[in-house]
UniProtKB/Swiss-Prot annotation:
Subcellular location: Plastid, Chloroplast
Pfam families, A to Z: Ribosomal_L23 (PF00276)
Function summary: Binds to 23S rRNA.
Entry coiled-coil feature ranges: none
Superkingdom to which the source organism belongs: Eukaryota
Species per Swiss-Prot/TrEMBL record: Ostreococcus tauri
Presence of the UniProt keyword Cell cycle in the record: no
Family: Belongs to the universal ribosomal protein uL23 family.
Major subcellular site: plastid
Self-association and partners: Part of the 50S ribosomal subunit.
Name the UniProt record assigns to this protein: Large ribosomal subunit protein uL23c
Recorded GO MF terms: rRNA binding; structural constituent of ribosome
């Protein structure tokens, strides 16, 4: 299950969203919003209120190739809940 979460996104925007209990992850492209919600709730034991997703554009590599597209999920938790990886 944890293989579906590729990485935790740490950008300026994602750190600003941490104050309002929103966490940003890069996830597997084939996951739906309900799959992401149940995955986070089962892994961390928190209550997920909303999941927003968007697909990032492909990036060109240096020598004539492209990197695959990824899906980014912004997860909003119930007030008072936090993820242990950010403590």
């Amino acid at each position: 299950m944890i293989d579906f979460i590729q990485r935790v996104v740490v950008t300026q925007k994602s750190t600003m969203l941490l104050e309002s209990e929103r966490y940003t992850f890069d996830v597997d492209v084939n996951l739906s919003k309900t799959d992401i919600k149940t995955l986070i709730q089962d892994l961390y034991g928190v209550q997920v209120v909303a999941v927003n997703t968007h697909r990032l554009p492909r990036r060109k590599t240096r020598f004539g190739g492209v990197k695959t597209r990824t899906k980014r999920a912004i997860i909003r938790l119930k007030n008072g809940d936090t993820l242990p990886i950010f403590d």
